[in-house]
């Protein structure tokens, strides 16, 4: 049941003195876009009459079919707390429609909605809890981003070591004011690194909340004279920033992943779900870890997974079964990072897990030892494989995975792969500072 009607939104906008509305949507690569309108145009927007040029976005449409429509999701109406309180600014997240009046198949929000519909057809609803990590750095005299921090804090430290504590508190309070429930917030391992953990929510709401959170975090950071970055590995020699995703599955109020008679408390559906994730993870990585820089995080020694395995407690594998305060069984995927488009990341992970349930894909046995301590022979015997080691490798794996290509749509995949291959080849052509320092004077 919808939370808001058109009439309710128009009334709220008038009562709250809203003068400006941002119609937001997300492009193929997870970048938030928006069209701004005045309150006088709000009724037109709510009647789905706002048009934009889709040909101006990479991977959308050609110039011959450029006109596209924004259809606001009424339940996403929210006032932006950091904007002026006289003449307020609100936002609506929108679905993208083509000129024929159809949901645009290459829109990432549409792709996620298709997977949600498939889950509902199987009788399932997802609850997802993300853990979003990011860095806060100082800005230069012109307000530009740097990679400098005077923060000396470590994991769970507090002030005065944690210099970002006030900014992080304001971020949490801002998100709460927008109706987003934050479970916890704290300083992470690296200097200047922070984490916000969100309460479980339905899949589409989770993706919307992640996009909103990134927008709000950057905005609040700027107000504190800081720059927030979700770059997976912004500095050499420190822990990178991830986006751990914990998936729960519900059917008619029942915890689908739970079975008290099992050694690990897991149902057969939970095992199959993990099996599906592990089967498709090499191609999934091109979506959940979408940057060249993503694979600088997925290296040994910094707490990020590089091995395809699962455990009920061990944090070194790709998947673990976390302890939850509410007793609901969850499956945590540890490889994604916050550079990912959340709509696409959730879509491919959910679809892969559902494929595992449908195909009854049984995962290998759990690994409760630190995988880095195992020999190659031991890993092979335990069926432990590696995640892709680069964006180029992950994109090649996505190309080969017919199931994921079907989930995303071949037209979308072709555009996405073309862009990511171009990004990878551009990187390969670069001569880095490391190479110059290593070789210039002695070769």
Residue ranges, per PLM feature:
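ATP/Mg2+-dependent ligation/transfer catalytic cores
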Residues: 1-184, 206, 226, 381-443
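A generic structural motif
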Residues: 27, 97-103, 160, 200-206, ...
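Short glycine/proline-enriched loop/turn "hinge" motifs that connect secondary-structure elements
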Residues: 81-89, 125-127, 185-190, 238, ...
């Amino acid at each position: 049941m919808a939370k808001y009607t058109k009439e309710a939104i128009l009334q709220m906008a008038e009562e709250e003195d809203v003068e400006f509305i941002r119609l937001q949507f997300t492009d193929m690569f997870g970048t938030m876009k928006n069209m701004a309108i005045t309150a006088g145009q709000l009724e037109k927007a709510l009647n789905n009459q706002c048009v934009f040029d889709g040909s101006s976005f990479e991977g959308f449409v050609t110039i011959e079919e450029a006109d596209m429509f924004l259809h606001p999701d009424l339940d996403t109406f929210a006032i932006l707390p950091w904007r002026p309180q006289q003449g307020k600014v609100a936002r609506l997240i929108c679905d993208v429609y083509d000129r024929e009046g159809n949901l645009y198949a290459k829109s990432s929000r549409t792709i996620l909605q298709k997977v949600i519909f498939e889950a509902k057809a199987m009788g399932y609803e997802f609850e997802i809890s993300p853990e979003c990590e990011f860095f806060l750095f100082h800005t230069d005299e012109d307000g530009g981003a740097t990679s400098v921090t005077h923060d000396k804090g470590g994991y769970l430290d507090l002030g005065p070591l944690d210099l970002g504590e006030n900014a992080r508190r304001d971020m949490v309070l801002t998100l709460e004011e927008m109706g987003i429930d934050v479970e916890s917030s704290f300083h992470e391992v690296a200097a200047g690194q922070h984490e916000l953990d969100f309460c479980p929510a339905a899949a589409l709401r989770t993706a919307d909340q992640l996009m909103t959170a990134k927008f709000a975090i950057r905005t609040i950071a700027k107000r504190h004279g800081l720059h927030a970055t979700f770059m997976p590995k912004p500095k050499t020699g420190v822990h990178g920033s991830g986006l751990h995703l914990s998936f729960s599955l519900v059917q008619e109020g029942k915890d689908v992943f739970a079975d008290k008679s099992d050694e690990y408390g897991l149902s057969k559906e939970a095992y199959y779900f993990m099996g599906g994730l592990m089967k498709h993870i090499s191609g999934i990585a091109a979506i959940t870890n979408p940057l060249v820089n993503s694979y600088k995080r997925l290296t040994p020694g910094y707490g990020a997974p590089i091995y395809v395995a699962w455990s009920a407690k061990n944090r070194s594998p790709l998947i673990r079964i976390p302890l939850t305060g509410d007793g609901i069984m969850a499956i945590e995927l540890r490889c994604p990072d916050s550079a990912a488009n959340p709509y696409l990341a959730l879509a491919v992970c959910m679809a892969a897990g559902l494929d595992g349930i449908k195909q009854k894909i049984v995962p290998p046995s759990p690994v409760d030892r630190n995988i880095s301590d195992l020999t190659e022979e031991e890993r092979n015997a335990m069926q432990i494989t590696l995640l892709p080691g680069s964006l180029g490798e992950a994109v090649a794996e996505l190309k080969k995975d017919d199931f994921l290509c079907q989930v995303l749509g071949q037209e979308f995949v072709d555009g996405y792969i073309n862009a990511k291959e171009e990004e990878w080849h551009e990187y390969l052509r670069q001569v880095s500072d490391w190479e110059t320092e290593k070789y210039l004077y002695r070769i």
